[in-house]
Amino acid sequence: MLYPELFKQLEAVRWNMETDIPWSSFDATRLTDEQATTIKMNAITEWSALPATEMFLRDNRGDSDFCAFMSIWFFEEQKHSLVLMEYLRRFHPELVPTEKELDNVRFEFDPAPPLETLMLHFCGEIRLN
């Protein structure tokens, strides 16, 4: 079982949005409208951790170790969207995604064998990086 050790490792490097980000040093005047819009689109895209997690839990129902890990993965992945939305709330509040915009990325993936589900996500992450 990998989850207990993974939990310890990930817990040790957890970051806090309020204390680990130097919000007061940000200069909103340096952000272009195009950059702010890109931040909004990324915040919406990152929100898709929710349907991805639902897919992983569904397709890996028989693997409690992996499903337990997904609880940490989802928490950390969702923070990506939240920190981008917090940035917008502070510096471009008119661009904070609406609940409807966030709901629009909640879609169902077709059921697939567990390894195919994982590869789909892994390939997507590599493509984005």
Would you name each region that the model predicts?
Residues 1-129:
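Non-heme di-metal
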